[in-house]
Amino acid sequence: MRREHARAILFPLVRLPWLLIVLALIAYGAVLAGGIVPALTGAAVSGIAMFTLGAALAIYTGMRVGAAPVRLGGRAASARRAYLTLAFAATGVLYLAVIFGAINTSAGTLWTCQTWPGCAMTGDSAWLALAHRGLAGGATLLIAALAVQTWRIRHERSLRIAVAWALGLMLIQNLVGLAQVLLAQGGESQPVAVARLMHLGLSATAWGALVVLTTLALRRPFPAVALLRPAHVARPGMTDTVLLEGKPSLLKDYISLTKPGVISLLILTTITSMYITPAGIPELSLVLWTTLGGWLMASGSHSINCYLDKDIDVNMGRTGRRPIPSGRIPAWHALALGIALGVVAFVILALFVNLLAAILALAGFLYYVFIYTIWLKRTSKHNIVIGGGAGAFPPLVGWAAVTGSLAPEALLLWLIVFFWTPPHFWALALIRQKDYARAGVPMLPVVEGDQETRRQIVIYTLSMLALTALPPVLGMLGWAYLMSAAVSGGLFLHYALKLRRDGTTTTAWALYKYSLLYLAILFVAMAVDRVVFA
């Protein structure tokens, strides 16, 4: 009887926060539509709606998370006050940014302030727009500082997830806000309306994540000795509770998930491809945006690769020291990082380069993740041959970024990288053959043996060299490139034939290392020939 009575009381209370959330979102949506309500009324409605949303989220979070007070010493108590002050400051500043955003939407300042970050116009409209942008920038900095503090001294997974969502949403909404200003220069359109709704909607969602974070920080026990004890030494099997606490090399570990050393060569092929198109020398801003978008897209695919290959990496000496198999970073962090980087990269390329470049970069991302990592790498001895197509997308992205289209010349660049990949990677596979066998990865040396692998390296090397001779024949490049390609290609063939003959680890290492230099020399020679000697 008591249980039924308690249920009768608590059930409506559990439903109440969700009812408040729905009502708040409906009210806020009316303001986002823009022009439906006057500016001051819009500010009042949005303010009440956001306050109601925050209160409902705080109530719901508090009901789900029981309070666990802890008596703290002076140092820990001071750290807790500082952390909560930062959390409340970030929440408050973002609340004001959301309100000013709603006021700007109702007042239509988007059409009077179409420059960024400042305003060419003066008056009340400019003041409103600048106030909103200043508050949004301040909120972003506060959330970033809060994220650093959360990862440094708070080990609870729920807090880290909440602050990651808040920071990620805030960064994305900033990009959408910039895109909104650029799109508005072309007048009212459906993309502008969509961007406006996304911009304010994302900021409101980020504010909700901050409210949840602050509520959790108030209810959860603060680590009494988090600032005093030394960092934990990571071990395989460590739980999220102790993982990453005070780890000084955390940033380095996250960067390593993206494999920056590999990306640098990919980006080089992207940049040089931009300089050999018929369109001539591209603008520096276009090169920079393409480089940033391409780098982030490749970083995202590599991060997801680390997540998917965690069971393989732990069995290999070369990869066993990576952050995930060594236990320094939870695997799901790599997945979340990869998805976030891919989304941001696509937005950057689509907005500041062109849609074709964004689609091609995304195609390379999906090719690498699904066709190579998930499917071929684990099932076929041809994994490197077919999967190597993923690494050949960067030249296509660079070409499309400048021309807005693809041409046979761009596909030739794709083929050159495609045929370069097997000799390059099989040389490493010969060296790491035992590791791949232990991990159950059917690389060609594991399945067919050393002799067949060395023979295939020579075959693909000859095919690659034949392709590199085509640009001058097709009138795409001239004699300067041809001389560089002949000399560097001859040295590549020398290493491949030497490996075919003696099959030593030393020769395999020599071919592997030179193949990296060779691709860089080849594409730089293309750009130099086009820019200097054309």
Swiss-Prot record:
InterPro entries: Protohaem_IX_farnesylTrfase, UbiA_prenyltransferase, UbiA_prenylTrfase_CS, UbiA_sf. GO terms for molecular function: protoheme IX farnesyltransferase activity. It is a multi-pass membrane protein. One of its GO terms (cellular component) is plasma membrane. Keywords: Cell membrane, Heme biosynthesis, Membrane, Transferase, Transmembrane, Transmembrane helix. GO terms for biological process: heme O biosynthetic process. The keyword Cell membrane applies. It is found in: Cell membrane. Residues 1-251 are annotated as: Unknown. Residues 252-530 are annotated as: Protoheme IX prenyltransferase. The chain crosses the membrane at residues 17-37, 39-59, 83-103, 128-148, 163-183, 197-217, 261-281, 284-304, 339-359, 360-380, 384-404, 411-431, 457-477, 479-499, 508-528. Its EC number is 2.5.1.141. Pathway: Porphyrin-containing compound metabolism; heme O biosynthesis; heme O from protoheme: step 1/1. It is an enzyme of class 2 (transferase). It catalyses: heme b + (2E,6E)-farnesyl diphosphate + H2O = Fe(II)-heme o + diphosphate. HAMAP family: CyoE_CtaB. Carbon 2 of the heme B porphyrin ring is defined according to the Fischer nomenclature. In the C-terminal section; belongs to the UbiA prenyltransferase family. Protoheme IX farnesyltransferase subfamily. Converts heme B (protoheme IX) to heme O by substitution of the vinyl group on carbon 2 of heme B porphyrin ring with a hydroxyethyl farnesyl side group. PANTHER family: 4-HYDROXYBENZOATE SOLANESYLTRANSFERASE, PROTOHEME IX FARNESYLTRANSFERASE, MITOCHONDRIAL. This is Protoheme IX farnesyltransferase. The gene is ctaB.
